[in-house]
Amino acid sequence: MNHYLWSLYLQAGGQTIVERFTAFETGDREKFAAFIRSLMQAYCPDAALIDDVAIDIDDAISALNESEEISKNEELSADKDSNLRNNPDYYEQVANNLWQTLRESLYNEVQDIGKVTDKEIFHVFCDNIVYFSVLDYAESPDMIPYFFPRLYNVLSSIAETFEIKLPELPSRRAYKDRFALYYNLNAILKAYREEQEWSSAELCAFLYDFAPKFVGGTNWIWSKLPEPSAAFVIGAPPDADEWLRKGCKENSFAWQGNPETQPGDVILLYQWTPTSAFTSIWQATAPGFIDPLFWYYRCIYFGRPVYVQPLTFRELRDDPILGKIPLVKAKMQGMNGTALKPSEYNRVLECLDSKGNDTSFLPKLTEHYTAADAEIRIERDVEKQLLEPLLERLGWTRAQYVRQMPLRMGRGSTVYPDYVILPQFTPNYEKGYWIVEAKKSISNDKQLHVDFGQAISLSLIHI
């Protein structure tokens, strides 16, 4: 962190933000929800999500005000804060205490310990993470309130920019590990705060005001969308009517979807009520991402809805093409994030058109090139069955490219790009027009950047 920039921030109004968090820590919680709402508007494009956060904050403050222990907790907070440095198990203890409290609360509801699973406990935590984090923050300023729900991409961008190493992402069904991640995150942020010699209020000002603006605010939402490269199906949430009421060009909404979603991709919204049907077509406004503290784990942002005459499940099922789609055969179960082939999506448009919908202005998809008889088992299959035929289709003959061209990087060190187009073999001065790296699969956007970086590194050696 550049201390000069931080000093300028404090002088330019940041000190007021710090003082507002300090006031909360000392018991002045009046209008705190409105204060956080104003901060979130700089980095969260989903107005409904900001509303939910404000409600959770108000609920937490109401619970604090009603607690007979609140004054006692405030008196002890300074002692707890001083003891944290000498207690490496503090965050684990806090996590275990809340986990046990949630377990007991769920048991009291169902009276069946067999139904109180890690999954159920974590679900309650996810749905109330802002609420619980505000309670934790009120008890000890070393517990940072969490105002990044469905915004882990923003937190990740901040961490990458300021060299804060976030915890490794647990798998989707590792519910207790995902729960622990929040407390591990608190420990990491505390260490960063101590490194910067900040107060807890300064850390909060950094996280929720300085840093989001520094990394671009809501600029991660694309204002000008590219042509779509894919189409995905999502199921409408319970508050779909609210979405439809607020939906407009300027709004983006967060929901579960496919993390491989890219800006411009088509999002087909399927509603279960009042009728089971596709009712609108949207577009992704940001890259999809994994959010381990979002119950559904996989998050997308989308907007720009176009409302259509519903295409019902019965019509999907009875269509000779759409009826063969595995998703339709499964009666639309597990739909969120399911990709449609370009031919399938375009068939949806044809069906909508036949019902009187004007589809001329809706985004279209074109088929991606694949070898019809390709059977891909290993990376070499990608090269032989997909890449080499593609190079020939682009006009390059086999005499114009070479596979595994050796590039010497010094004494005894050699690397081998998968393909080099128009190679020149002058020793120690090898050159080429461009290189191609083949991959059997790229699991996510992060891996795409890693693999692309590998190709760039190879191209900068000699090529």
Where are these regions (language model features)?
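An N-terminal alpha-helical hairpin/helix-loop-helix interaction module that forms a charged
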Residues: 1-125, 140-226
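Charged, often low-complexity linker/regulatory segments
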Residues: 1-45, 342-403
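Compositionally biased, charged N-terminal/linker segments
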Residues: 10-16, 212-263, 272-275, 340-341, ...
